């Protein structure tokens, strides 16, 4: 029984799966977006969020945990120097998955997984209010003037 067991096996051996996700999380954090299948991206999101959360902590133990997963020193440096401070005020959810159709060969659902960039949104422009119809104003103004004249 697999009660409470999280994660996806993706029909791979344990060593292959771990190596694949280590490579994928390294590529994602290095290039900030990659193109992959949807099940891989959903599992990769967990790994990437974990690495960025460790980058936000920034202590020695967190650095050693990241180095156990990400084997490239430049990427580890980027996690702690750029990504950790960038997402310091964000409590989680550092990645976005955008579906991109199906692969031609085997119809696998493909997607783009990318790191969220917190860009400032432009201020919303208020829509210009439409002027009231002219006919309605004239019709309501005429009886009021006639009533005053009759009094």
Curated annotation (Swiss-Prot):
Residues 118-151 are annotated as: Disordered. Coiled coil: none annotated. Pfam families: Ribosomal_L17. Keywords: Ribonucleoprotein, Ribosomal protein. Residues 131-144 have a biased composition (Low complexity). The keyword DNA repair does not apply. InterPro entries: Ribosomal_bL17 (IPR000456), Ribosomal_bL17_sf (IPR036373). Disulfide bonds: none annotated. GO terms for biological process: translation. GO terms for cellular component: cytosolic large ribosomal subunit. GO terms for molecular function: structural constituent of ribosome. It comes from the Bacteria. Belongs to the bacterial ribosomal protein bL17 family. Part of the 50S ribosomal subunit. Contacts protein L32. This is Large ribosomal subunit protein bL17. The gene is rplQ.
